[in-house]
Amino acid sequence: MREGDSGYFSCYDGNRFRLVILASQRAHELSSGACTAVARKGDKNTVVALREIVGEQLDLAAVFKLAVNRCRKYLEEFTNAREVAAARSSQAAPKSAPGQEIGKSFREKDPSAAAFLDQEQFFSGGGE
């Protein structure tokens, strides 16, 4: 974002991550056929979503809740798929090779790198 653009998004107090999550969720809704709250003017869904957010045309708490629910669903599917893959690999392959890092979580590999996103805070709806 350019220096002069900060006034447009003043309601986010510098939390660009939350803005991206909201715009992404709203663009996803628009792609799924939701009606726009502003004139489209030939803009793409991402631009329309940002214009709706800037124009305060949406219930942002509801949009954020939908984004959190969508993320939870994705994580559940990902976790289930990972468990199935782990079960299959444990049946077909030897237990583990020396130095193998497959199966280690992101936090186990580098705990400091994962500190930028507190998962519990995100899922509780607390963006700040």
Swiss-Prot record:
GO cellular-component term (any): DNA-directed RNA polymerase complex
Biological-process GO terms, alphabetical: DNA-templated transcription
InterPro entries: DNA-dir_RNA_pol_omega (IPR003716), Pol_omega/Rpo6/RPB6 (IPR006110), RPB6/omega-like_sf (IPR036161)
Sorted UniProt keywords: DNA-directed RNA polymerase, Nucleotidyltransferase, Transcription, Transferase
A Pfam family: RNA_pol_Rpb6
Region Disordered, annotated ranges: 87-106
Top-rank lineage group of the source organism: Bacteria
EC numbers, comma separated: 2.7.7.6
GO molecular function, one term: DNA binding
Catalytic activity: RNA(n) + a ribonucleoside 5'-triphosphate = RNA(n+1) + diphosphate
UniProt cross-references to Gene3D superfamilies, sorted A to Z: 3.90.940.10
Stated role: Promotes RNA polymerase assembly. Latches the N- and C-terminal regions of the beta' subunit thereby facilitating its interaction with the beta and alpha subunits.
Family: Belongs to the RNA polymerase subunit omega family.
NCBIfam families linked: rpoZ
Assembly: The RNAP catalytic core consists of 2 alpha, 1 beta, 1 beta' and 1 omega subunit. When a sigma factor is associated with the core the holoenzyme is formed, which can initiate transcription.
Name of the protein in its database record: DNA-directed RNA polymerase subunit omega
